[in-house]
Amino acid sequence: MDKESTFRALAESEKLVQSLTTFDKITLEDAFRALAERIGLTTRDLFGSIRIAVTGRTATPPLFDTLAVLGKDRVLTRLKFALDLLT
């Protein structure tokens, strides 16, 4: 993905995370799969961008387990940091 599409994906992901009232593996997976479809990205591209933004790595334990363990506040902080790096 290029810089613009990565920025858009992460910005939409940040909005999504902010809107979630439940932050568990199943809710996260369902929400992010729907987001990928809505913004026209493959799950591979979206999930890869989120993984790198949140963990700094290309390979991690299962993404949604990782997000749930990190928690909403930490995930939001890391997404915002990644967005700042892209601007």
Q: Where are the regions a protein language model picked out?
A:
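Conserved nucleotide- and phosphate/pyrophosphate-binding catalytic cores
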Residues: M1-T87
